[in-house]
Amino acid sequence: MSHNFHVIIPARYHSSRFPGKLLQEINGITVIERVYRQALLAEPKSVIIATDHDEIADRAIQFGAEVVITSHTHQTGTDRIAEVVAKGSFAPDDVIVNVQGDEPFIRPKLIQQVACSLTKTKAPVSTLCWPISSLQILNNPNVVKVVCTRDNHALYFSRSAIPFHRDDKNAYSNTFRHIGLYAYRAAFLLEFVSWPPCALEQIECLEQLRILWSGFSIRVDEACEEPLQDINTKEDLILAQQYFLDTFNV
């Protein structure tokens, strides 16, 4: 049974920290194919890989994926999936889920959750978070933190430790890390990428701040399952390969 949403996977080859990571293999299967397989398990209406790289496109076609070739000038994955939406026959209210191409173990239930959340809110965007479990994670600028209202809408995203525990600098209770999984209404996605970057976004290097700065809300739900590590470095790839061996007893 398919669900009423579409998945688009932005697949960039020239990652700054680990170029070509999507074509690296985990037990004989490329990272991008593993992401694609996980997305299919969420049972969306469609799964599309958006890329500007010939080898990624060729590999994706070989394993049966629908591929859209996009511009090489895009600065973000959101810009890339917006091009796919602009080229396609999507309705304005269609739900588009942006699944990052470097998450080979993305949980299908999280994809379903973020899509379902968008259908139950007036916010034009939904995303997920997870409780922070250590001071090290809280203080890591590569981990994006989020604080929310009582009705689960984002107040702010930051690379800094928020909220700041004034009376106990070693505390991390009631802190949450953002999970970079988004669902958008198709029409809003196209509107969003037409806006120029805002100052806050440029300071933090977090494009979702453009949405808040522009006066729109982002629904944020706690993930129904703990998210697994994405792949940003060669060390992450080694950990992912070991995780696969440990989990599946290969």
UniProtKB/Swiss-Prot annotation:
E.C. no: 2.7.7.38
Family to which this protein belongs: Belongs to the KdsB family.
InterPro entries in UniProt: Cytidylyl_trans, KdsB, Nucleotide-diphossugar_trans
Record's keyword terms, sorted: Cytoplasm, Lipopolysaccharide biosynthesis, Nucleotidyltransferase, Transferase
Annotated Pfam families: CTP_transf_3
Higher taxonomy: Bacteria, Pseudomonadati, Pseudomonadota, Gammaproteobacteria, Legionellales
UniProt function note: Activates KDO (a required 8-carbon sugar) for incorporation into bacterial lipopolysaccharide in Gram-negative bacteria.
GO terms assigned for molecular function: 3-deoxy-manno-octulosonate cytidylyltransferase activity
Biological processes per GO annotation: CMP-keto-3-deoxy-D-manno-octulosonic acid biosynthetic process; lipopolysaccharide biosynthetic process
Catalytic activity: 3-deoxy-alpha-D-manno-oct-2-ulosonate + CTP = CMP-3-deoxy-beta-D-manno-octulosonate + diphosphate
Presence of keyword Cytoplasm: yes
Enzyme class: transferase
Residues passing through the membrane, by range: none
Cell location: Cytoplasm
GO cellular component, as recorded: cytosol
Protein name (Swiss-Prot/TrEMBL): 3-deoxy-manno-octulosonate cytidylyltransferase
Record bears the keyword Cytoplasm: yes
Highest taxon of the lineage: Bacteria
Biological pathway: Nucleotide-sugar biosynthesis; CMP-3-deoxy-D-manno-octulosonate biosynthesis; CMP-3-deoxy-D-manno-octulosonate from 3-deoxy-D-manno-octulosonate and CTP: step 1/1; Bacterial outer membrane biogenesis; lipopolysaccharide biosynthesis
